[in-house]
Curated annotation (Swiss-Prot):
Name of the protein this chain belongs to: D-cysteine desulfhydrase
Native source organism of the sequence: Yersinia pseudotuberculosis serotype O:1b (strain IP 31758)
Stated role: Catalyzes the alpha,beta-elimination reaction of D-cysteine and of several D-cysteine derivatives. It could be a defense mechanism against D-cysteine.
Family assignment from sequence similarity: Belongs to the ACC deaminase/D-cysteine desulfhydrase family.
Alphabetized CDD domains for the sequence: ACCD
Assembly behavior: Homodimer.
PANTHER family listed in its UniProt record: 1-AMINOCYCLOPROPANE-1-CARBOXYLATE DEAMINASE-RELATED
Modified residues (N6-(pyridoxal phosphate)lysine): 52
Length: 330
């Protein structure tokens, strides 16, 4: 049974539509002396784009199957995931409740009210603030219980949409990448931001089957490689099991030198990467995820960390709305 056929066994809403572009970054390639390509998941069609829409195709389909009328999720005040979940809820006529934290403890007005947070108000989200998401699964379960007591039928969407069901979205994306690359380019490496781990795990499972010669590198955005690896591995294993795969799982490669000082806080290397891509290619990265992932790619080339010198694919997971929240730092 093909990977495509296995995916059809899971209910899925068509939210992404056509395949997102896969393009060569010609000016960046000339600048670096290395072929760099980009998968433009920043231009998925709902609410200013981003990778979470692929996960929500499966998660929202499951919510509707279960008869839910409310999506309950959590994240940072500037969460791209919460923004996209809220937009999908609005599109489907569902209520949305979001549990938010301020992970960087800032009082800057732009962070508290602009960017993704502004969009939550437009989508009519019921926002609940908490001190910290120390145990998000338990906190979401408790919030769902309260929502249910109010007469709603909640469906919990995990942080980042990252569980085995949501990660199917990036198995699906792997099929897109393989089809777009076929006969055109043979990638030696694929670089992606690794945070809640679902995108990374989905690509790990999909690309292992479809582009086995490409090394997948996750650039961590919130924790060390030792802390991140079990998170990726847990979803990777659950995903492979759900798809009936019995082959040994692909090795998890993580680079963790680019997320400091912490999740959600910009750093010089990430901001430099944002400015470089904007000025060379007219493409916007963000200071939380893709800026740091691109910083990893740039440093990886400079430090000769890639396994060979073939073309590199960068997965652009979106996040540009957060730029407005981080002014004037960016």
């Amino acid at each position: 049974m093909t990977l495509q056929h296995k995916l059809t066994q899971f209910p899925r809403l068509d939210l992404v539509g056509n395949a997102t572009p896969l393009e060569k970054l010609s000016r960046l390639s000339d600048y670096l002396g290395r072929e760099i390509y980009i998968k433009r998941d920043d231009v998925t069609p709902v609410a200013l784009g981003g990778n979470k829409l692929r996960k929500l195709e499966f998660l929202a389909a499951d919510a509707l199957r279960q008869g839910a009328d409310t999506l309950v999720t959590a994240g940072a005040i500037q969460s791209n995931h919460v923004r996209q979940t809220a937009a999908v809820a609005a599109k489907l006529g569902l209520h949305c409740v979001a549990l938010l934290e301020n992970p960087i403890g800032t009082e800057q007005a732009n962070y508290l009210t602009n960017g993704n947070r502004l969009l939550l108000d437009l989508f009519n989200v019921d926002v609940v603030m908490c001190e910290a998401l120390n145990d998000p699964n338990q906190q979401l379960a408790e919030l769902a219980t309260r929502v249910e007591a109010q007469g709603f039928r909640p469906y919990v969407v995990p942080i980042g949409g990252s569980n085995a069901l949501g990660a199917l979205g990036y198995v699906q994306c792997s099929l897109e990448i393989a089809a777009q690359a076929a006969g055109n380019v043979a990638f030696s490496s694929v670089v992606v931001a690794s945070g809640s781990a679902g995108t990374h795990a989905g690509l790990a499972v999909g690309l292992q089957q479809l582009l086995p010669d490409a090394e997948l590198i996750g650039v961590t955005v919130s924790r060390s490689a030792d802390e991140q690896r079990p998170k990726v591995a847990q979803i990777q294993q659950a995903l492979a099991t759900s798809l009936g795969m019995t082959d040994p799982l692909a090795k998890i490669t993580l680079w963790d030198s680019y997320f400091a000082p912490q999740y959600g806080m910009p750093n010089e290397e990430g901001i430099a990467a944002i400015k470089l891509l904007a000025r060379l290619e007219g493409i916007l990265l963000d200071p939380v995820y893709t800026g740091k992932a691109m910083a990893g790619l740039l440093d990886g080339i400079e430090q000769q960390k890639f396994c060979d010198k073939g073309p590199i694919l960068f997965i652009h997971t979106g996040g540009a709305p957060a730029l407005f929240a981080y002014h004037p730092q960016v």
